[in-house]
Amino acid sequence: MTQNDIDYASRVFTERAARILKNHIKKIIMYGSCARGDFDSDSDVDIAIITDMDRKAVKKYDSELMDAVTDIAMNSDAVVEYICLPVDEYNDKKGWYGYYKNIETEGRLLYE
């Protein structure tokens, strides 16, 4: 995977997620090795979607979001792994819980 693949994947996934989830998105953040710049050919593109919906409500969009992931994989060497996090949960945990803290401190904001 190259930086061009990462740029393509993050741009296309962000555009598609914004269309799918519309006004429910608070932030989209790329995190992990691609955000830090220490990715390799086996890395995936980790993306957190911070949303105003609870986990159960956002599940109804999984199929459309997975279609975006599949389209990206078919058109590049990038594999996107995403997670949807409720904004209240994210804000409560980003200061102390390791996973959320890494997203907050190492992440690259893609959409707000």
PLM regions: where:
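Recognition helix of helix-turn-helix/homeodomain-like DNA-binding domains
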Residues: 33
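Short beta-strand->loop micro-motif that forms the acidic, two-metal-ion catalytic signature
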Residues: 46-49
